[in-house]
C-alpha cells in the first residue's frame, strides 16, 4: 500500500469537489441571466449540491466497509463526469438541477471514502492530516474563483469554466485505478457493525453532530452564496470568496503546529469566536474593509470542517466510517435546507429594500450560528479538559 499515492489521489478528488463549489459560486449570476432563472430557482440549484452530498455520503459510509473503497471511488468519478458534462450541455432549470445533483452525489462519495481513508493511512496523526487533506477544499475554491474571475473577464463563458474540472478528474481517476486501498480502521480493529451503529448514539457524538450543523452553515452557506449576496456591494464580490478561501488554505497547511498548541477543542472554540467577528464585518462593512472582513472570516472558518471530522476520528473511533459520513452529511443537509430558506427570504427582502441591505440582512441573520457555537465549544473545551485530566 502506497499511502502517499493514496493521499495525493484523495487531494485531487477533493480539488474536483472544491472546484465545483468555487466555479459554481462564480457562475451563479451568469446561469441566472442565461436561463432567466428566479432568485428562488438559482438558490434551489445551488442547494441541490448540498443535499445530493449528504445522501451520497451516508450511503457511501454504510457501504464502504462492505464493498471496499475502490468501487465507491469509481462511482464518484462517474457522478463527477456526468454532472460536469450535463452542466456544460444544460438547456434549462431541470438539466442544471440534475447536473448539480450528480456533482453533489460525486462530492459526497469522495468525502465518504477519503475521510476514513486518510484516517486509516495516518492513524498516528489524524487531525493534522485531515486538515492537510481538507486544505484542498478552500485551495480548490481559490483556483475555482480565480478561474471564474479570469474566464469571465476574457468572455470565455461558464461552459469553459466547468470544463476545467475535467483535468483533476482525469488525474484522480487514473491514480486511484493504479493504487491498492486498505481496509477501514473499524474493520482492522475488529469492531462489529452493530457496535459501530450503537456508538452513534453516544451523547458526545450527538453533540458534535448538532454542532456540525452550525459550523457547516457558517462556512459553506456564506462561501457558496457570497457572490449573490454581496455583488451589489462590491464589483468583485467573488474576490471576497477568493481571499477568505486563500486564508483557509494557508491555515490548514499550518494545522500541525496549531493542533499541538491549541488542541482540537481549542481550535474549534477559537474558530467560532473569530468567525463571529468575520461574519459581522462582512454584514456591516463596504469598500476595502470588505476584503479585510473576508480575511477575518476565512481565518475563523479555517479549521471547522476538518477538525470536527478529526475530533470524531480521534475521540470516537468506534463510530467508524459511518460516524465520519454522518457528521459530514448532517452538515451538508443543514446547508441545503438553510440555503433554500435564505433564498426565499432574500427574494422577499429585495421587494422591500435594495440589494445591498437585503444581502446584509441575510448575513446578519446567519450571525446567530457562530455565536451559539462559541458557547457550545466553550463547554466542550471545559468538558474535554476535565475528561482528559481524569
Question: What spans do the regions from the language model cover?
Answer:
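Extracytoplasmic gate region of multi-pass secondary transporters
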Residues: 24-25, 201-249, 338-343
